[in-house]
From Swiss-Prot:
Gene that produces this protein: ATPC
Stated name of the protein: ATP synthase gamma chain, chloroplastic
Subunit structure: F-type ATPases have 2 components, CF(1) - the catalytic core - and CF(0) - the membrane proton channel. CF(1) has five subunits: alpha(3), beta(3), gamma(1), delta(1), epsilon(1). CF(0) has four main subunits: a, b, b' and c.
Active site: 133
Keyword Transmembrane found: no
Amino acid sequence: MSCSNVTMLVSSKPSLPDASNLSFRSAFNPFQLPSQNSSSSCTPSRPTSIQCGLKDLKNRIDSVKNTQKITEAMKLVAAAKVRRAQEAVVNGRPFSETLVEVLYSINEQLQTDDIESPLTKLRPVKKVALVVCTGDRGLCGGFNNAILKKAEARIAELKELGLEYTVVSVGRKGNSYFNRRPYIPVDRFLEGGSLPTAKEAQTIADDVFSLFVSEEVDKVELLYTKFVSLVKSNPIIHTLLPLSPKGEICDINGNCVDAAEDELFRLTTKEGKLTVERDVIRSKTVDFSPILQFEQDPVQILDALLPLYLNSQILRPLQESLASELAARMSAMSSAFDNASELKTDLTRVYNRATQAKITGEILEIVAGDIECIIW
């Protein structure tokens, strides 16, 4: 005797098996298991209907087991890589931040002496270059989606300001995203490596340097995912060029074109009510000792440090993005592993109940046949 189809209800947290969960009616015998409505049994919150044969059910269990092994392996690999990526981020931040402070101080001295450098010259903004850093692989939750949404939001802001824009895409996911949207102008597509290197950062730096110096663009912004912790990361917009410690980069009409993320929101009171004001963030500068003197001219020092500045300011976001991607992948694979374990438990329970119902039905048919023989 075979049971072709078995229909069971499985919730996210199924209750203990009882007689009310089994219902079987043979096609040849009107006998049916009695149904008992127990008030103590938990009502499934969102039941999911599983309707398939025992063989298909067994295949689904095997498939879930294979998926569980894959997600566990990917979680372990991401956990092993994220530690090294996190160390690279933590070790690289002090150098990058100190270099920016020194450059800002030298730049202020140059502005005092009315000396201009190509990368520090402020000019009315007509066109903005957006360097968007994404990942090369998927299966990392909403990591790539978050930074691409940030890029779309920034593009919408630039359109409202009446400014032109171009995109420098870094990462395969970003390349695929912008390739499917031909209406977004892209200057260059770049693929990231497994580990960010100074050579890869130099390639991006050379591209944005040529765009800015040739005045094809008047401002370069870097969009990346800042690594905060293993469970948190934030999409960030960072102004890369021109090098301005005060911000306030304006267009030809004098309107500020800085992104909202470049400003600090302060909660204050106005007329007895809470209100939000925006205060421009001013980067910290290093106060050099009066005894400290430069052997070379400050312009020469700035020209020598600016390539190092560009390289470090691009390498650090690449490292931050990689650490955020690995942390997101580890979290996503951990959730997928837990979901696969729960689904395997539910499917196994359904399979066991279906097998039990099949055996019980066959026993009932045998008993019914014996009773029919006795009656005759």
